[in-house]
Amino acid sequence: MAANKYAGTQTEKNLQEAFAGESQARNKYTYFASVAKKEGYEQMSALFLKTADNEKEHAKMWFKELAGISNTKENLAAAAEGENYEWTDMYESFAKTAEEEGFHELAAKFRAVGEIEKHHEERYRALLKNIETAQVFEKSEVKVWECRNCGHIVVGTKAPEVCPVCNHPQSYFEVREENY
């Protein structure tokens, strides 16, 4: 990732706070939109969502200033590191504190979410390995590939360069999973 030119400054702290605040606002407004929609307030729901989208863009602007966005390979590595911290340190620490304070059900939730974060880390590391070994769109074994745009199916070791049905690029193909 690019160097953070604000490292060690109050401005860096301000950018981090701005990023956190905008990110939290985005999520809150998304949740508020769901409530408004359930209560029959479609316009209010839409306005919460519109504002949430604005907040997302504000957060992105500050995160870019912090040099937090890079290429996919580096983004996957950073995401895996973040998920690792969450499941190995953060949620376990939160669970211990909750237990000490008598909040046993909350402690169990913290640990359960920690397990989910562990799976997120594993997923990101597997995807990173696919990039590092050039196994994103080509596998050593025959796979069923599906175009995420039109649903076209291809059986083989490699996704086509272009979907023969909708002409979308190879990047739209994924290994098909049927878990139903």
Residue ranges and their predicted role:
Residues 1-180:
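Non-heme di-metal
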